[in-house]
Amino acid sequence: MAVVRTDLTGGVMTLTLDRPEKLNAFTIEMMQELIDAFDVADADDAVRAVVVTGAGRAFCAGADIFGGTKGFVDVEKRKVGAGTVRDGGGLLTLRIFDGLKPVIAAVNGAAVGVGATMQLPMDMRLASEDPKFGFVFGRRGIVPEACSSWFLPRVVGISKAMEWSTT
């Protein structure tokens, strides 16, 4: 089942995160579909820019932590080197950073966790009138993910990055 809709109109490829019933919560499937779409965009000369947006009332509410327990069941599979994805948001963030086409975030509603961090390597971020950005890692007792500890200070400055990451 596709969780990212793609549309190419007038040289602009629009990627729409399409899980509105879950506020477009991020999954490994979504990560792979986005990476694949960025690969297609880079390979297609008809694509001049990429816009990433969310369906419904949110851009992306962060990682889908309620998506089931199958990732936690087999402890052996979670060991380093066992082929598991540890930071899907980081893989996506680096893919966007390595891209050849300009990327614009069109933010509607909430952009939390990976929903905020995936935007950091994008060239522009445009927001609706009432967006909600959340770098909630400190409140969750986890370290910032998706390469945000590298990108965030470069986008907003070290002082603002520290404030956003720790409060």
Question: Each predicted region: which residue ranges?
Answer:
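Glycine- (often His-adjacent) and acidic-residue-rich active-site loop
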Residues: 54-98, 111, 141
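Histidine-centered beta-alpha loop that forms part of the nucleotide-sugar donor binding/catalytic region
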Residues: 18, 63, 108
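Residues at secondary-structure transition points
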Residues: 3, 21, 25, 32, ...
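Conserved CoA-thioester-binding segment of acyl-CoA-metabolizing enzymes
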Residues: 1-55, 71
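A generic local structural motif
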Residues: 1-3, 35-39, 89-94, 120, ...
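Hydrophobic/aromatic residues within transmembrane alpha-helices
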Residues: 15, 52, 64, 118-119
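Crotonase-fold acyl-CoA enzyme core
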Residues: 94-167
